Curated annotation (Swiss-Prot):
Gene Ontology CC: one annotated term: nucleus
Classification lineage: Eukaryota, Amoebozoa, Evosea, Eumycetozoa, Dictyostelia
Binding site for Mg(2+) 2: 609, 611
Name this polypeptide is given: Probable DNA topoisomerase 2
EC number of this enzyme: 5.6.2.2
Molecular function in Gene Ontology: ATP binding; DNA binding; DNA topoisomerase type II (double strand cut, ATP-hydrolyzing) activity; metal ion binding
Matches recorded under PROSITE patterns: TOPO_IIA, TOPOISOMERASE_II, TOPRIM
Note accompanying the cofactor annotation: Binds two Mg(2+) per subunit. The magnesium ions form salt bridges with both the protein and the DNA. Can also accept other divalent metal cations, such as Mn(2+) or Ca(2+).
Organism of provenance: Dictyostelium discoideum (Social amoeba)
Encoding gene per record: top2
InterPro entries: DNA_Topoisomerase_II, HATPase_C_sf, Ribosomal_Su5_D2-typ_SF, Ribsml_uS5_D2-typ_fold_subgr, Topo_IIA, Topo_IIA-like_dom_sf, Topo_IIA_A/C_ab, Topo_IIA_A_a_sf
Reactions listed under catalytic activity: ATP-dependent breakage, passage and rejoining of double-stranded DNA
Keyword terms, alphabetized: ATP-binding, DNA-binding, Isomerase, Magnesium, Metal-binding, Nucleotide-binding, Nucleus, Topoisomerase
Region (Disordered): 1-87, 1007-1047, 1192-1222, 1335-1521
Cleaved signal peptide residues: none
Amino acid sequence: MSDSENDYSDESSGSEYESPVKKGKSAPKKPAAAGSKKKASATRKPAAKKATTTTTSTTKKSTTSKKSESDNDDFSGDDKSSSSDNENVFKNIASSAKKGKSIEEIYQKKELLDQILLRPDTYIGSTERQEEELWVWEDKRMVHRKVSFVPGIYKIFDEILVNAADNKQREGNMKFIKVVIDREKGFISVTNDGAGIPIQVHSEHKIYIPELIFGNLLTSSHYDDSEKRLTGGRNGFGAKLANIFSTKFIVECADSKSKKLYKQTFTNNMRSKEDPKITSYQNKTDYTKITFYPELDRFGMVEFDDDLVALLSKRVYDIAGCNPTLKVSLNDEELGIRSFEKYINLYFPDEENAPKVYYEKVSDRWELAVTLSKESQFNQVSFVNSICTVKGGTHVTHALSNIVTAIQEQVNKKNKGSADIKPAFIKNHLSVFVNCLIENPHFDSQTKETLTSKISSFGSRCEPSEKFIKRVLDSKSGIVASILEFAQFKDQSALKRSTSSGGKKGKVSIPKLDDANLAGGTKSEDCTLILTEGDSAKSLATAGISVVGKDHYGAFPLKGKLLNVRDQSTKVINNDEINNIVTILGLKYGKVYETLSDLRYGHLMIMTDQDHDGSHIKGLIINMVHHFWPTLLRMPGFLVEFITPIVKVFKNNQKPISFYTMPEFLKWRETNDKGWDVKYYKGLGTSTPGEGKEYFSDLERHKIDFEWDEGANDNIELAFSKSRADDRKKWMAEHIEGTFLEQFGVKKLTYSDFINKELVLFSIADCERSIPNIVDGLKTSHRKTLYSCFKRNLKKEIKVAQLIGYVSEHSAYHHGEASLYSTIVGMAQEFVGSNNINLLNPAGSYGTRIAGGKDCSSARYIHTRLNDIARAVYHADDDPILSCVVDDGKKVQPKFYIPVIPMILVNGCVGIGTGWSSTIPNYNPRDLIQNMRLAIDGKPLKPIKPWYRGFLGSIEANQGSKVQGGQYLSKGIWKKLSDNRFEITELPIGFWTQDYRELLDELETPGTRKKKKEEKEKKAASRKGTKAKPTTTKRSKRVDDDDDNEKVTEATVKSYTNYSSESTIHFIIDTIQPVDEINIEKVFKLVSTINETNMVVFDEEGRIQRFATTTALQEHFFPLRIKHYQMRKDFLSERLSEEYSRLSNKARFILAVVNKELVISNVKKVDLINKLKEMKFDRIINKNSNKSARDKIKKKKNAFDEEDAAISSDEEKDGAQEEQDDDTKGYDYLLSLPLWSLTLERVKKLIEERDSKKKEWDILLSTPIQEIYKRDLDALEKALDDQDAYDESLKNQTESLKKRTKTKALPRAKKISAKVVKDTKEAPLTKLVKPTVKIPTTTDSNVSGSKRKKSDDTTSTSTSTTTSSNTKPIESFFAKEDKKPTPAVKKSTLVSLDSDSDFDDDVVVSSKPKAPPKKTSKVIELSDESDQESDQESDQGSDPESPPKRSKAPPKKPTTIATKKATTSKSKVIDDKSSDDEVIKAPTNRPTRSRVPPPKSLSFLDSDSDDDDLYDNEESSSDSD
């Protein structure tokens, strides 16, 4: 039995229906009952849910709880206990039976009208009085207060009012609605003009149309669902409900077409009606007027009270606001509301602290306004086709989706340290007003409190403009700030709760902690915790602690840099590193420390590397303590730093000298450089344990106490607070180069000095690593890589892994290999969206646009070399004039290279440093070449726009953008194929293929991304052994409180097909809606923005500058480039002059010796020097010590014989004798000539070279630098032509191969026989048991055959031979058969191979007679060897304990394993062809296999370069690699 079957079980006996109201009238205790209801309501008040604007609900939970009292008061039934609808139905029947009721009396059928009167809740809501916090019209404004009202009477009024408003949507000429609420007479009338109701008889029902629609249930003009309507009526109840719940209901209709006036009166709850009165009507205006007298007794009312009138008046104002073109009047007073925006202002009338309201008319069907919620609780006032949806619905969720998403992105961006803010949390801080027109709306019930229509059926979309969203996000709105404030409060509360049980403990168990013995005890204040930078530093500290003792000193290694805890509360909770430190020290969040006795340690010592990153770690620790426990920093001696030397110098047996700062060492080196050996201590790991003990033995000398000062608070916040990024820019700009912190001998250090003199150096270095230089467009890591490639003259491919090592060694790169790997890969990538000019050549898989380069191979698999175009960009002739950086005491990369065009605009950049970030798009190098030519000619530069190599889409200026600086729109390419199909052949810049596939999956199946994210979090949590955190919050039953507020809410894509390759884009998409009805570019994200608003770079002086336009950047670059062309010309001219003089003097010298004018044998060197001076030979000292390595290689290449090599090599020996005086050095180029070069032939050749140099010199002097520049531009343009030809060849190759290759699938796999299927089922792999039988010994072979008989559990095989017919499959070793082994072949050719080597060129072949076959046990082991393990080279053959790894032997080579003589037990190895994963474990006594030696390891050419040279080319054209 269902609940519905018992709906009428509480009725009094009798089949005739009696009005419950009449019974209520006759009841003498009616007023008392009403009073008791109020009292009951008051007692339940504290438990009631707090009402808001959202909950202007006419049906509350209290309705159900009050129903029993209502039933008791309204009905005189005997069984009061059975009056509740929620009572058990069987109890009701049993109770009724006891009272003598028959089955007919228990089960009743009611007419619909009677059922409506009996159960009004379904149709109009409760008929009982209730109290709620609602908006009402009072004192000429909207007021939010507690209201006592009956929802039912409110609803019947609303039905008549909405009917009038619906006429506006049906009839556009409607002009007014007049509402009269007569409190004295107890009636309400609603009048509207517009198209009237036809006054004629319905042909089917034989009654007039007005009577049909106002006096008969289930009549409506809205039953045709194929018709798109924007009205509120739907179910055929509407106005009839007002008639049913009224004592009198008067209908008055004027029809100008039929010239009739219709008037009819209904009474007795629509049961009685008068005949219609039809009179003549001559007016041209149609109208409809409904007047009704609510049955107040039914609603427990005597009159229209103040609360009801205020509530009904508010609904009249609602209608006026939703229909601003209508003249709406209330009690003959026109309201004068002409827009929805003005209606909204009624809620905030001239308040001093009124929040700013942001309104937008999105379209003809959507109006939207958003403001900050004062109560931090979501409020909404919404209307659907003039119906007030007090509980919101899908329209509110849809209207807010874009806004909430934008706020969420903004908040999460500013609140990076905390957990992502959920949409529901954001909505709690919003108040929203929505007015919309929805086609054929669906509601949760007849009360129409919640819209339930699907968004796809709305007939329109609410898409607020970017301008509106930006206004909402503006700081003036206070929305983002309010959300951030509450989020931080929430995080801080969670943080405080997370360590509520912390504090001082005797012992703690934390991995890698070496706890002090007295820590946590009574003497804990005397203990010191040493935080070290990594494990290696901890070992140094441990060695030192052995000197001072473990009682008072503990050590704990940090994994790396600590988290910046400011605004990072949620991350702090989940940060193991910080939690460990808090536990070790015994700290508690939120506690103010006045003494150190509550801690496990009284001192915190920081021991980090003496470099920039070490300074940063110190700062982060200071920041953490200052943020959570600032009073600890004020306690003298709590925070201490341990300093170690950064440089030590050694000389013979003298005592080493230590330096603790680089400026200090450089100052010393100016006067004390000779004879000293220098050792750089970049990390603590450089120090030996012995040195560590020395440091700790003189602890007072190596520690510095931090001291609180007046400016400490401000300076620490300056360095680490996110809100002070602009202050940090000024802070770094004001730093004076050369300023350093004196450490050695200092006992105390103020926090301000540390921040302003030490930490600032890290911030500057961080920017140098992250932000490129305007001159060469390179960051430091890119410059070091390019320098190393030029130094090595990298013309032949080497592995990236090798290049990483080379760069680290030769450019003093001090960071991780992973960072350098990403740098090298990034310089070589050439897919769309990466480089316009890739300086390195990608030989291997360097990533594609499928994953944006993330799909690149490991460094050990890919190769690279210098790209041919690199030297066209960075000309070799500029190398000698560059100023180099000195690192670790040697010259490394230049401060900047000087390219032919501004490379900063060619490949762009993205970088984030301290206080600064930089984002520069890519531009066409040909445009830059053209602009440089214009600049050479003194003409103005042409504007350029972003350009990306290989991109087929369009990049256009965003004309509507109000962003300061240039903004462009990058658009993909799409084409309509049919009504519901289109194709995409290009994506906007930065949108990778894999990401786009995920977007299409989301558009096809909404929620896909969320599901993948949850799965990823679950996997990550399972690896850590923790529970995955829920990604969704608890959902509310209310539609507009739904937390799942994602951008994609409904499916748009029916299906799609992906034809994209690694370099091209091609998707064919089938849509659910017609293509023409979809905003393809927006929905499918085929447009992205490219900004020129953050072009930040270092200039040539090392200062950070921001450029507003690309033209300004080019104008800054050009004079710098011209200046360096002049420097290049001057240098080359000086060098040619020197070479001319050198060749002339050499020719004269050789000629003088040959003619015996100069005697060089048996002469003192001093006399020889004087003779050379007398003969006026030029003294030539190599001033241009920083010579181009390119010239050296060129000369070596041109040395055709030993004499040429000897003459050219003398230049490299200039200055080799450091102890010589200047006179001797000046003539070394002559005196170092070999004797066998002093010939007349050599004189002739030298004169020819001299004349050639003179000609070259003259040409150089006569060529303007502008002409030199143009030649370089021409050369670069030619290189670009070659690059374009290369790109085209790749494209043509693909097309050519596609034409030659027929597109077809692989042949289908063949079916297997039934016997094989049966065998497979009988012996499934899952049931296999690994055989483990001991290896037989020689003694076992002599056992009688009966003893060696195979049992059911023993596996036996025949001896493996070279004959394929005797080779058994692996299944034979698992088969339970007892077959005799096949006799072995008498002779066998044995081949020994190294299965691990790819170089098995030497094969040992032996032919030995075989002994009779003997049963030998095998141990077969299944291996799950990974690809990585198989890549490693190992000598398994020499290790009898380790099983050999299987590897496929080279083709056409036998793979039989050699065996021992018959006297020993034979080891048999099975050639398993069934599985690559099964590895055969050889017996312990297997014979030694012949092993082919590996090829000689490759090594770099030795470098004995001059430190004075920019490059020492280690790789000539005949590179051995």
